[in-house]
């Protein structure tokens, strides 16, 4: 199925590599952000580098591959996919540069390019669901995620116009709230759907029904409806939805057949710990510390955990599997530098704990070290692309 429906690995790898480049830039942007003024251009630049640059780039790359697997059919179209990737890079780079330099023309150009790129991807992604062989929780959740993405980026461009040109008498705080809700919801629903497929696969816990995932789905939608009347109560619904997701994910990991711990499940457990630390910091008004634990803690650990599983898997099937029976081929686990993975995990843990104690800048610099060890593994993965070339 993978070989029948898979898009070119170069497209998926392009988004992954771009995501990590954006992450490196986000580390430095964090140092210049003012989290006491969350709507400042410097702060907005960091959030867009991290979420629209790193997180969304990884998600798009993964969706090009995983959508075909979940739906058991080819992605709707790959025409102009590479052009769209270039447009995405120009868009996010221009938008962030416009924010940092406060140049209206660059802000408009970058925001417009990013809007077109994400809408094109969102539409081709949603059209992939037409004629799907399976229609279950995973497909519904992933489809809703695509709808949320399109709505979210449109609201985001309206905010760009508001910032850059002061368009009309728009309710800025309401627009910002729903922009965050829809873009965050796109990520949340995609993660819900994909996790309901990947968690049983990677953890070998096939008897989990994911009832709390479904409750999380409903609570997040209800949270959006409540946001219209009250941001506070809407956030409570969304928070409970996220809590249900975490509980079910932990339950699935607890029910795994192989009880050993490795760089994958340890990163996931650490990610949930960082999310709890972020919530505690926010409760005590430590906004900068909370943002660090959420971004470079939870999201970083959660994404890296799955990178360790997904990228070797894709490279093995695209570049190594044709040589099975012809020469000795590596196992998936042999493709991962375990020492580098565990050092990155340990450094990331130290970073978050130090930052939570108030030494955020030190945590940021140490995070560069953790990121470096993750990149070492990425380089090792990519070296297998040339496997068998000497035969």
Whereabouts are the PLM-identified features?
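Hydrophobic alpha-helical transmembrane segments of multi-pass integral membrane proteins
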Residues: 1-391
